[in-house]
């Protein structure tokens, strides 16, 4: 019996040793896997954090812009659009695109808002050009009856599907191929700014044929005094 017990004990000890070695091997594999995946995980966390920071900053920008006092002044819109076109010249030159700024009517409105609106739309036009053909962006406009001004930013880029014509102006919405940086805030910000100036924004577009954004503003912005309704 003693020999049998000793044999059983030996087998138990051998199994315990084997299990321990197997556990150590598994632990080593886990540690190795964690070490291999750690840089990717950290990179993902960092990218997610940076994206969240950009979203928060953009939302704060929307909020601040909504509270900023508007300061109407007479604006040379031709000069403004030309300066914006110059600011993206390195991008258009690199892609073989061109921006044509036609003579634009003056307007009495808020300079900061108008620069942000036109700048954002021109930036978008450059960003979403179709690299399969020479890019063309045309900025035009005219006075219209009733004291209104219309401006157009037209391009021959990728275009926008009809189902997305309204959705692109919603917060965090983007359309088409997602191969350009952005969080879907630009056009929501533009529409908010246009409305603050008493204007409207619409888009005419077809996939593969380009887009035209139409801006309509009162020729003269009237800013209400605090507590005074217009």
Residue ranges and their predicted role:
Residues 1-47:
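Histidine phosphotransfer helical core of two-component systems
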Residues 155:
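Acidic ATP/Mg2+-coordinating residue in the GHKL
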Residues 125-126:
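Short helix-loop "hinge" at the ATP-lid/N-box region of the Bergerat-fold HATPase_c
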Residues 160-172:
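Short conserved segment of the HATPase_c
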Residues 194-195:
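Detector for a conserved hydrophobic position within an alpha-helical segment of the HATPase_c
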Residues 39, 71-86, 138:
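A conserved beta-strand-to-alpha-helix junction within the catalytic ATP-binding
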Residues 137, 141-151:
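Short beta-strand-loop-beta element adjacent to the nucleotide/active-site pocket used for signaling
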């Amino acid at each position: 019996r003693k020999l049998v017990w000793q044999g059983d004990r030996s087998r138990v000890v051998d199994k315990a040793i084997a299990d321990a070695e197997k556990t150590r091997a598994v632990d080593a594999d886990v540690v190795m896997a964690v070490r291999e995946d750690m840089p990717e995980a950290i990179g993902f966390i960092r990218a997610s954090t940076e994206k969240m920071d950009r979203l928060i900053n953009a939302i704060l920008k929307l909020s601040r812009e909504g509270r900023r006092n508007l300061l109407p002044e007479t604006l040379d819109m031709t000069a403004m659009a030309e300066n914006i076109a110059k600011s993206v010249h390195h991008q258009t030159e690199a892609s073989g695109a061109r921006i044509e700024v036609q003579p634009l009517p003056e307007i009495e409105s808020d300079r900061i808002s108008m620069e942000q609106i036109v700048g954002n739309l021109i930036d978008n036009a450059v960003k979403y050009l179709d690299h399969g053909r020479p890019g063309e962006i045309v900025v035009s406009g005219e006075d219209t009856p009733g004291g209104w001004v219309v401006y157009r930013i037209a391009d021959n880029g990728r275009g926008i599907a009809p189902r997305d014509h309204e959705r692109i102006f919603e917060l965090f919405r983007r359309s088409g191929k997602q191969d350009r940086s952005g969080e879907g805030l630009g056009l929501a910000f533009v529409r908010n700014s246009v409305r603050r100036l008493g204007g409207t924004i619409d888009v005419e577009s077809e996939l593969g044929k380009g887009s035209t954004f139409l801006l309509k503003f009162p020729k003269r912005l009237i800013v209400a005094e605090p507590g005074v309704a217009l």
